[in-house]
Amino acid sequence: MQNQRIRIRLKGFDHRLIDQSTAEIVETAKRTGAQVRGPIPLPTRKERYTILISPHVNKDARDQYELRTHKRLVDIVEPTEKTVDALMRLDLAAGVDVQISLG
């Protein structure tokens, strides 16, 4: 696994879960002897929705909702076999989407 890099992207709606999962990944990678870069916070995507409250009249009566998607990036430089094994066995929170790419 020399001269390789593992890039892990985490996405989720709750930033506390993402930070907790990122800390677990970083701690696991450092414990197995890999060099870690990150966690790097990426821009938060904010989706705003405006909904009419009234079914017929009162155009001014509206509710506004916002959905925030938080993202983090972790690079693992020079991973060892033990690092890959430990990351495969790692159990993360259910509200976190994990994308792993080798580069």
UniProtKB/Swiss-Prot annotation:
GO molecular function: structural constituent of ribosome; tRNA binding
Top-level taxon in the UniProt lineage: Bacteria
Family classification: Belongs to the universal ribosomal protein uS10 family.
NCBIfam families: PRK00596.1, rpsJ_bact
Protein species of origin: Shewanella baltica (strain OS155 / ATCC BAA-1091)
A single BP term in Gene Ontology: translation
Organism lineage: Bacteria, Pseudomonadati, Pseudomonadota, Gammaproteobacteria, Alteromonadales
Name of the protein: Small ribosomal subunit protein uS10
Quaternary structure and interacting proteins, as annotated: Part of the 30S ribosomal subunit.
SMART domains named among the record's database cross-references: Ribosomal_S10
